[in-house]
Amino acid sequence: MAWQQLHLQCEKDNVDLAEALLLEAGALSIALDDAGDQPLFEPLPGESPLWDEVILTGLFDATIETGTRDVIEQLSHEIAAQVQASRSWVSAVDDKDWEREWMSNYKPIECANDLWIVPNWLTPPNPEATNIIMDPGLAFGTGYHATTRLCLDWLTEQDLTDKVVIDYGCGSGILGIAALLLGARHVYAVDIDPQAVLATNQNAARNSVDNRLQAFLPEDFTAFWQQQNIAPVAVMVANILAKPLIGLAPYFVTLMAPKSRIVLAGLIESQTEQVTEAYQPYFALDPKHAFTAQEDQHWQRLSGTFTG
């Protein structure tokens, strides 16, 4: 299979917007690199410092219409203008080169409260911790991205004991698997990408929770839900993008039990108000706010309690 890479060089303040635009355009993964020679000191757990000038590289499937060279060239000009990129370019990469580069970029990380994400080809640094063994493949969700970490942090704060959870936009399955390892009874994982469904099932097996997780494409999940007459769930996790989050609000509430909890991520600061407006009619205020908004750089996390 052939791939196209879109490279953008921009200031760190524009990185979150660039990531959001690349994902919205269909990027399968995004890597960040230093555009100069600026050193970064070892970060604290959960921190993700950035260089002043950053090169973002988005990976696109060149075998589909939205990933052809001409399309990606045009996309590079459009996104570069929006993020004030100092330069942009497109390159091709084959499977073997990408696999080598991809594996070398990952190491175990502690995300929250003794919860570790460990690539499946490495050994957990702390065998006594809660270790999620991951091979994300080409599905989104490695634990390195701010939106994933925001959701993982939220999950560790919830009482998930014997709860049924929906992980909508599951990517690699990392959030659903984390929920199971933190005490959930069962997880329904949903994603529009067949590769994500495959990766989720494989990662669930790696963590010995495949008997408690079912992964679906959206249309298959809807049919399954209706045919099996599934009871409303106690927890909903949706780490996708602002536009689909807004459109899915009325659908999500049909899947949720009264007083169930929801967390939403994948939106940047400028999108928070619109997403809040879409969900606030259905969700009660948290202790001090309608939603808890937690900022990791410019990415936002919203959470609330269903009143239906």
From Swiss-Prot:
Record's CDD domains? AdoMet_MTases
Q: What is its EC number?
A: 2.1.1.-
Enumerate the residues binding S-adenosyl-L-methionine: T148, G169, D191, N239
- Give the record's GO CC terms: cytoplasm
Q: What class of enzyme is it?
A: transferase
Q: Which UniProt keywords apply?
A: Cytoplasm, Methyltransferase, S-adenosyl-L-methionine, Transferase
Disulphide-bonded residues: none
Under the heading InterPro entries, the entry gives:
Ribosomal_L11_MeTrfase_PrmA, Ribosomal_PrmA_MeTrfase, SAM-dependent_MTases_sf
Q: Which domain of life is it from?
A: Bacteria
Q: Name one GO molecular function term.
A: protein-lysine N-methyltransferase activity
Identify its protein family. Belongs to the methyltransferase superfamily. PrmA family.
Query: Known PANTHER family for this protein?
Result: ELECTRON TRANSFER FLAVOPROTEIN BETA SUBUNIT LYSINE METHYLTRANSFERASE
Q: What is this protein called?
A: Ribosomal protein L11 methyltransferase
Organism per entry:
Psychrobacter cryohalolentis (strain ATCC BAA-1226 / DSM 17306 / VKM B-2378 / K5)
